[in-house]
């Protein structure tokens, strides 16, 4: 199937082949775990089990920031598991989430009542909290603070609907913006990045909001099926009486209008994303931050004006994801990628769409203010004949290529 999808994109096919034949290791070097303590090895095992995508880029981080981010991720995953578990009553969830930061300092605390897929991070929380306490104090302080603030925010929205666009921003801040702020403070604390990276909480928050809004927009149907609602009523209420009404065939037109309005809302974070990424100096940190962002803008471009969002999960092509991962290693390339996808959106904006003028104006502002002198260019450096030859050669060994690592597919799936 991936071969068929790549027929119209030979450069993606070539990059898939390069990635499978060793290009992945040039970008994401394999981490040597032999020297790690048993508890830290276990943490990385849980990281592999709960998120292959983040496991890859976390393990590519330099120095001690790698372990700090690994532990931070597992703690957040544990909190997210509590929040998402529909088998746990709200009455039990609220104190768990509000007090979760205190469990970091309780060596024996664990939670064994979860039925969620990733419950192991709760059942063996003593291993994770041990490695938390083994971190440098400068990292512990950041992680505990973010954990406390996020737990209170999650608890707040257990009994509260996402009604207004302000509520949407607030919820996304609690579950993703705080992650961006926490990571930024870790990067600065490690001295891999300048203090401004950790101090500018507005840009760090936008990094998280852009990713979270993309996930919420794309995962409309999945969330509906699971009984979750994250689209703001202030927007969808203009088109239907109930959010689930968008799946009805007779509502396809208004569903797409609502979708486009939400995507337009998400695009407003792009200037902050560009500012944030332009400040990064460490290559491993840049890769860690840039890749999810370019995946997000590509996903929004795929979702824009696309009624398939209401029929299933819209994914970018695996070859497209690989190409983005391999390209997004420097700021000029990232700007070119962003420019490409906002142009795709711009040219698909229906004139009759209620948010059309706002979308076009927003994209025009991004062009002139955040992407000056940037132009739409092909990122392929290979001749059509050469690419065709590579495709023919690769087709003969496609069975081998079919074992391609799942790391790229996970990048375009929702992170809980």
From Swiss-Prot:
Domain of life: Eukaryota
Listed SUPFAM superfamilies: Terpenoid synthases (SSF48576)
This protein's name: Squalene synthase
Main enzyme class: transferase
Family: Belongs to the phytoene/squalene synthase family.
Enzyme Commission number(s) from the entry: 2.5.1.21
Binding site for Mg(2+): 80, 83-84
Effect of residue 286 to Y/W/L: Retains partial activity of the first reaction. Retains partial activity of the second reaction
Source organism of the structure: Rattus norvegicus (Rat)
Cofactor: Mg(2+)
Membrane-spanning residues: 284-304, 384-404
Reaction catalysis annotation: 2 (2E,6E)-farnesyl diphosphate + NADPH + H(+) = squalene + 2 diphosphate + NADP(+); 2 (2E,6E)-farnesyl diphosphate + NADH + H(+) = squalene + 2 diphosphate + NAD(+); presqualene diphosphate + NADH + H(+) = squalene + diphosphate + NAD(+); presqualene diphosphate + NADPH + H(+) = squalene + diphosphate + NADP(+)
GO cellular component terms listed in the entry, alphabetical order: endoplasmic reticulum membrane
